[in-house]
């Protein structure tokens, strides 16, 4: 996207203003043609051929342009249609945020590049974004032509990628590249390389032994924390089965213990990550893993677990209240009570029978 931003300025060294406008007009016509090829429903009955008019349609802020972008986003990610349907009546900014989020996940724009979706960015940048989005739709359409659903297409692509990687890593050519028979270094460099290799192996061995000791200590502390957590869990369920209401103080103490163990576990994980980043990472000869950000999934899982915990607390409170109510009713049924102004003493059940006979 940086290249597109650089091409949006006026008075460049390589192209004149007229040539820039001409290239933008051609790009607009190409994007318009791709939209027609994909049977965009918002272009039905629309007959325009003038490049300037097409550019104004695709690059000027309007509700019509926003509907075309919404259609393109739903073609890339069909489940987004349900999200848009639930957002009817809300400000347009919310839909723009959703489309910007999708564009960022597809690595087509920045996470805060909402001006691009609104149509306030330069025309060349907007057309480049639309062109890449349309290419994504076309690739999905071609890939899904032999599959009955989008998920089957993704599954088929994953299997093909795994087969390709397996073939690549099992190929003899890869092993020859990793372990060449002929040393590429000249002879006068060999003694220096051997010395550096010996020094590195010695330093690596000593560092590895230290890291193994640290890892063993961290593993031991982690096992102790896990044992404490298991003991607390067993204690909690034992108290729950006995039906002994420990009271708010006991629950608070148990909660504090769980928080303390969780905090210790968190500190151990942070220490392990610090050791790995600072010292273990230097000994590894492979790049670090490419982790995909799953923040929204973790946040949604945390919210679901919180709601489930609150629901369990409500159920426990209702169960305790119901048990107390039943116990109170049982006591009153067998207890002799004076009813009204009468001096006679009788139980609740006897009084009810007397009223029914009347």
Swiss-Prot record:
Gene Ontology molecular functions: microtubule minus-end binding; thioesterase binding
Family annotation (InterPro entries): Haus7-like (IPR029711)
Tissue specificity annotation: Detected in spleen, thymus, testis, ovary, small intestine and colon, with highest levels of expression in testis and ovary.
Tree of life domain: Eukaryota
Compartments reported by the entry: Cytoplasm, Cytoskeleton, Microtubule organizing center, Centrosome; Cytoplasm, Cytoskeleton, Spindle
Job description of the protein: Contributes to mitotic spindle assembly, maintenance of centrosome integrity and completion of cytokinesis as part of the HAUS augmin-like complex.
Protein name listed in UniProt: HAUS augmin-like complex subunit 7
Species per Swiss-Prot/TrEMBL record: Homo sapiens (Human)
């Amino acid at each position: 996207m940086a290249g597109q931003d650089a091409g949006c300025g006026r008075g460049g060294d390589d192209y004149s203003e007229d040539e820039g406008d001409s290239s933008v007009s051609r790009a607009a016509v190409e994007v318009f043609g791709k939209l027609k090829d994909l049977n965009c429903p918002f272009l039905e009955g629309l007959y325009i051929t003038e490049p300037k008019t097409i550019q104004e349609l695709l690059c000027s802020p309007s509700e019509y342009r926003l509907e075309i972008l919404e259609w393109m986003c739903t073609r890339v990610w069909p489940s987004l249609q349900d999200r848009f349907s639930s957002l009817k009546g809300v400000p347009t900014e919310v839909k723009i945020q959703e489309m910007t989020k999708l564009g960022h996940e597809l690595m087509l724009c920045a996470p805060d590049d909402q001006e691009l979706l609104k149509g306030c960015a330069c025309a060349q940048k907007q057309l480049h974004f639309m062109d890449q989005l349309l290419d994504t739709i076309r690739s999905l359409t071609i890939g899904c032509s032999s599959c009955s659903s989008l998920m089957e297409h993704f599954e088929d692509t994953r299997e093909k990628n795994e087969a390709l990687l397996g073939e690549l890593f099992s190929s003899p050519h890869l092993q020859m590249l990793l372990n060449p028979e002929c040393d590429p270094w000249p002879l006068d460099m060999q003694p220096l390389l051997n010395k550096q290799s010996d020094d590195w192996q010695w330093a690596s061995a000593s560092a590895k032994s230290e890291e193994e000791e640290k890892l063993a200590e961290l593993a031991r502390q982690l096992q102790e924390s896990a044992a404490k957590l298991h003991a607390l869990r067993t204690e909690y369920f034992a108290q729950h089965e006995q039906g002994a209401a420990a009271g708010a103080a006991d629950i608070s103490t148990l909660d504090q213990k769980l928080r303390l163990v969780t905090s210790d576990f968190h500190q151990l994980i942070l220490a392990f990550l610090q050791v790995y980043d600072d010292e273990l990472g230097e000994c590894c000869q492979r790049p670090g893993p490419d982790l995909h950000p799953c923040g929204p999934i973790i946040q949604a899982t945390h919210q679901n677990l919180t709601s489930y915990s609150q629901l369990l607390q409500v159920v426990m409170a209702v169960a305790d209240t119901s048990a107390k109510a039943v116990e109170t009713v049982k006591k009153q049924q067998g207890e002799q009570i004076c009813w009204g102004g009468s001096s006679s003493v009788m139980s609740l059940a006897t009084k009810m029978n007397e009223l029914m006979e009347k």
